[in-house]
């Protein structure tokens, strides 16, 4: 498993993994859309491509082999969104997702 523990200054204060994982996301009653999850921590994630998103509306994400999770969009840049989980992932859940994803290497900042 490739991830790094960020120092206490980082706002996520959690393990972080750079990975590639195809998921589905939606807001409200909109249709599910395929998105690429590129970055994951216990606190949140970064996805690419969610057309017509709304910053104030909760986002639901379906990660393979997981229940639907709820998150809030915290930032966006072009087709990339940074999201925070409504409830942080338990470390065992985080490690399960990372183990089942394609690992690109540790995230460097």
Give the positions of each predicted feature.
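Short, conserved beta-turn/loop elements at beta-strand boundaries and strand-helix junctions
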Residues: 28, 42-43, 76-81
């Amino acid at each position: 498993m490739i991830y790094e523990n960020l120092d206490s200054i980082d706002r996520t204060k959690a393990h972080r993994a750079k990975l590639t994982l195809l998921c589905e996301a939606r807001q409200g009653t909109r249709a599910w859309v395929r998105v690429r999850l590129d970055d994951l921590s216990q606190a949140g994630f970064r996805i690419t491509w969610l057309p017509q998103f709304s910053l104030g509306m909760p986002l639901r994400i379906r990660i393979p082999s997981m229940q639907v999770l709820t998150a809030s969009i915290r930032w966006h840049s072009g087709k990339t969104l940074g999201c925070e989980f409504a409830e942080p992932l338990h470390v065992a859940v985080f490690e399960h997702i990372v183990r089942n994803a394609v690992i690109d290497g540790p995230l460097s900042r």
